[in-house]
C-alpha cells in the first residue's frame, strides 16, 4: 500500500474536516498492507503512518536527497526511492539492501514536462517504488516511466498540453 500525501484539497468531504482526520482515513491503506508500505518521507502526516503497519518492509520516498530518516533507513539496508541531483538533471534512484540503483532522469518522463512538473516527478517516484516492491524488473519500470504521459487519451483533464490550438 502507498500514501503519497495528506493535503487540504480533500477536506470537507464525508465529515472529514481536519488534516489529522484525513490522515487517519488514509492510514487504513498502510494498516492493511502486507508486503510493503510506501510512504512519503517529506510529508509529516504520512511519515507518522510508519508506526501503524505490519508490512514486511517500508519504502520511503523523498525528493530531499539528504533526508536524515531516509538516509538512516537506507544505511540499515531499508528500501527507499530518492531524487538525486546529477550532471544531466534529477535522477530517480532506488535503494534496497544496501544497493544503489539509478533508475531514470526525470526529464525523460513525458508527464514531468522535462522534470518541471514536480508533482508528476513524485507520482513517478511512487509508481517506481511500488513496482520495485512488487518485484518488477528495473528495465520494465524504466520503460513504464518513459511512457508515462498526460496526453488527452491517456489522462483526460489532467494537465493535457495542446500544441495545435491557436492560443
Give residue spans per PLM region.
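Flexible active-site lid/hinge loop adjacent to a nucleotide/diphosphate
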Residues: 1-60, 65-72
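Adenine nucleotide phosphate-binding catalytic loops in nucleotide-utilizing enzymes
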Residues: 16-23, 55-167
Amino acid at each position: 500500500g502507498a500514501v503519497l500525501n495528506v493535503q487540504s484539497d480533500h477536506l470537507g468531504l464525508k465529515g472529514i474536516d481536519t488534516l489529522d482526520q484525513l490522515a487517519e482515513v488514509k492510514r487504513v491503506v498502510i494498516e492493511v498492507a502486507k508486503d510493503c508500505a510506501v510512504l512519503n518521507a517529506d510529508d509529516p502526516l504520512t511519515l507518522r503512518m510508519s508506526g501503524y503497519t505490519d508490512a514486511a518492509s517500508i519504502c520511503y520516498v523523498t525528493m530531499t536527497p539528504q533526508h536524515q530518516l531516509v538516509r538512516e533507513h537506507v544505511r540499515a539496508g531499508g528500501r527507499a526511492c530518492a531524487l538525486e541531483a546529477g550532471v544531466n538533471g534529477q535522477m530517480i534512484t532506488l535503494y534496497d539492501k544496501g544497493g544503489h540503483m539509478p533508475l531514470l532522469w526525470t526529464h525523460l518522463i513525458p508527464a514531468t514536462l522535462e522534470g518541471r512538473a514536480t508533482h508528476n516527478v513524485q507520482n513517478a517516484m511512487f509508481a517506481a517504488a511500488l513496482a520495485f516492491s512488487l518485484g518488477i524488473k528495473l528495465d520494465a519500470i524504466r520503460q513504464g516511466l518513459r511512457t508515462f504521459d498526460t496526453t488527452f487519451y491517456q489522462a483526460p483533464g489532467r494537465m493535457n498540453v495542446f500544441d495545435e490550438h491557436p492560443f
